[in-house]
Design a protein with these regions (language model features):
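Juxtamembrane inter-helical linkers in multi-pass membrane proteins
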Residues: 29, 33-50, 194-217
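Mid-bilayer segments of alpha-helical transmembrane spans in multi-pass integral membrane proteins
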Residues: 80, 99-114, 135-151
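Interfacial loop-to-transmembrane junctions
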Residues: 270-297
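Transmembrane alpha-helical segments of integral membrane proteins
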Residues: 113-116, 241-244, 264-280
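Alpha-helical transmembrane segments
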Residues: 6-17, 92-105, 167-189, 255-256
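Juxtamembrane/interfacial segments at transmembrane-helix boundaries in multi-pass membrane proteins
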Residues: 93, 147-175
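Transmembrane alpha-helix boundary signature
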Residues: 57, 76-92, 111-120, 154-155, ...
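Juxtamembrane boundary at the C-terminal end of a transmembrane helix
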Residues: 299-307
Length: 307
């Protein structure tokens, strides 16, 4: 049953991933007092791209062509292990925290290298920014989750989620600080303003994506939308596990589905609000701002030691 749930939730997350991007676009347009495109516009764009021929630069190699499939494949793999409707990971063999972090690193590595594989200065610059952002944000996410893992006594995502589900009051301060650090890292990982440095449309014309076209571009856009949804679901599923099933039942499954949708919708609205209240950061100022997130993670670690 757990394997079936893992496969089904991965397919559902894959299917609704463009809907997340479309919802963010609609929310952004409403906050700008514009009508904007519909929530299904992202599906139309991707389907149109999938029907076209994929053309790449002459200098590009196999990494450039393989990256869209790696992005989608890695994110689907992560999606099978996330707690979406259950407190425990439906695929325990992939549920270790270190495994999930390394899978995210693989996707980022291929995305950055694909920009260097084209010979274009725009994609190379976007790739360097993507790599730099990974260096800045991954320690925040890793340290924040590691504090939660220390409270749980295990690096497995099921143990962490179960511990937070019962919320140990004696460890509230380190857990709240770890939550803030991981929320900061999640926002950066989703590539929203003010941290969309690699794909900055005004400066770099989509950065590492600028040389993709046709079906390859459509698959990569779908993969990026899936990554945003997976990152958001990992955060809300681990740090806000209430409403998820502890044991399987039809009523519990229906309730968990409704709660999961509500949590994602609230997350999308909060992200859209923050995204539209800030301008893009200067490239040189990014490292100074990300120190705030690392400060939350470090304070969580110190408070855990003191406690």
């Amino acid at each position: 049953m757990s394997l079936l749930i893992a496969l089904l939730q991965a397919l559902v997350l894959f299917a609704v991933a463009p809907l997340l991007s479309g919802s963010v676009r609609v929310a952004r347009a409403r906050l700008h007092n514009r009508r904007g495109p519909g929530v299904l516009q992202e599906y139309r764009d991707i389907l149109k791209l999938l029907g076209r021929q994929s053309v790449g630069p002459d200098a590009s190699g196999w990494v450039f062509r393989l990256t869209p499939y790696v992005m989608v494949g890695v994110m689907l793999t992560i999606a099978t292990a996330l707690p979406v409707v259950t407190v425990d990971s439906p695929l325990p063999v992939l549920g270790d925290l270190i495994t999930l972090i390394y899978l995210f690193a693989i996707a980022r590595f291929f995305f950055a290298i694909s920009g260097l594989d084209t010979g274009s200065p725009f994609t190379a610059l976007g790739s360097s920014r993507e790599a730099m952002l990974g260096v800045l944000v991954e320690p925040i996410l890793l340290l924040g989750l590691w504090v939660a893992a220390q409270v749980a006594g295990s690096t497995h995502i099921s143990a962490i989620t179960d511990t937070l589900y019962h919320w140990p009051a004696a460890r509230s301060i380190p857990l709240i600080l770890a939550l803030c650090a991981c929320a900061f890292a999640t926002f950066i990982e989703m590539g929203k303003l003010p941290f969309d440095l690699a794909e900055a449309e005004q400066e770099l014309q989509e950065g590492p994506l600028s040389e993709y076209s046709g079906s390859g571009f459509g698959i990569l856009k779908w993969g990026i939308s899936l990554k945003q949804l997976v990152v958001l679901q990992m955060f809300v599923g681990v740090f806000f596990p209430w409403g998820q099933m502890t044991s399987f039942s039809v009523g519990g499954l229906l309730l968990a589905l409704v709660v999961a949708i509500v949590k994602l919708v609230v997350g999308v609205l909060i992200i859209a609000l923050f995204e539209n209240s800030m301008a893009r950061l200067r490239f040189c100022a990014t490292s100074r701002v990300t120190w705030a997130g690392f400060g939350f993670a470090f304070l969580a670690f110190v408070s855990l030691l003191v406690a």
